[in-house]
From Swiss-Prot:
Binds 2 [4Fe-4S] clusters. Binds 1 [4Fe-4S] cluster coordinated with 3 cysteines and an exchangeable S-adenosyl-L-methionine and 1 [4Fe-4S] cluster coordinated with 3 cysteines and the GTP-derived substrate. InterPro entries: Aldolase_TIM, Elp3/MiaA/NifB-like_rSAM, MoaA, MoaA_NifB_PqqE_Fe-S-bd_CS, MoaA_twitch, MoCo_biosynth_MoaA/MoaC, rSAM. The gene is moaA. GTP binds at R33, R82, T115, K175, R277, V278, R279. It catalyses: GTP + AH2 + S-adenosyl-L-methionine = (8S)-3',8-cyclo-7,8-dihydroguanosine 5'-triphosphate + 5'-deoxyadenosine + L-methionine + A + H(+). Residues 24-242 form the Radical SAM core domain. HAMAP family: MoaA_B. [4Fe-4S] cluster 1 binds at C40, C44, C47. This is GTP 3',8-cyclase. [4Fe-4S] cluster 2 binds at C272, C275, C289. GO terms for molecular function: 4 iron, 4 sulfur cluster binding; cyclic pyranopterin monophosphate synthase activity; GTP 3',8'-cyclase activity; GTP binding; metal ion binding; S-adenosyl-L-methionine binding.
Amino acid sequence: MNTRVGTIGNASLLTADAHPMIDPFGRAVTYLRVSVTDRCDFRCTYCMAENMTFLPKKDLLTLEELDRLCSAFVAKGVKKIRLTGGEPLVRKNIMYLVRRLGEKIGAGLDEVTLTTNGSQLSRHAEELYDCGVRRINVSLDTLDPDKFRKITRWGDFAKVMEGIDAAQKAGIKIKLNAVALKDFNDAEMPEIMRFAHGRGMDLTVIETMPMGEIDEDRTDQYLPLSKLRADLEKQFTLTDIDYQTGGPARYVRVAETGGRLGFITPMTHNFCESCNRVRLTCTGTLYMCLGQNDAADLRAALRATEDDALLHAAIDEAITRKPKGHDFIIDRTHNRPAVARHMSVTGG
């Protein structure tokens, strides 16, 4: 295979396919999720405590450092980068990083995308498209403005709708993500699905995950998606399809709407056997698994020298520790999360 090496930032990027990182179980790691901030302008009850303590800003990597880290991963075979948070679009000057990552598309990287709550989309949609972002995920758990305010604690539903409108107008494809919550939005799922499919958007429903101490009781929130699917099949014809986006969702086609519906089931049917991702936090911590605590400190290697050899070695060592699967359980006895850190730190 012929390759040509170019340089973006401090890391070398291969303009042809780099050899992918392979974990101990033979899985290629080609997907990097980057939590650019732990801060969010919402406080969704299943994700955060109301009075969260956030990381001191001095502890965060600079956007230039995040760019350098991402470049190193692209040089090591990562094809897709997703920016997450917290809420990624509340990070000051975040579009600098988006633009830098967009410049890597076609130079080793296939796609830059992000997951957002939609609150800042109306301001950034056109620039996101200009930077090379072609599809995003928007988290939306209800279409009822009052319920939306309750679940987010103070979110503005109208602002999110404006953001979705702006993104679609800019040419960005949207997939809606909805966390399935018992006795909150389970009865509303048909309406959410019709809304999404009516606007040309896929909908993915997600089981709540036991991460971080929150004010709510997760045993009260938890809804197995097997039950949700059974309920939906009383009204709709769902046919399993072989459609993949590089993530863990298993998709069906809904005959009555013509749209796609995805199920992400970390609790009832985990997706670990095909896991292709690692997660980088805004402090330079690399988590090899969403549901495990083992992590690698890449910040030390990043700041030790301007040469990337030490950083590449640290990444290689971390990949050798990627586990076979997660340890998610809903602890009904002690009501403790399976993982102490909040989703907003890891980025989902």
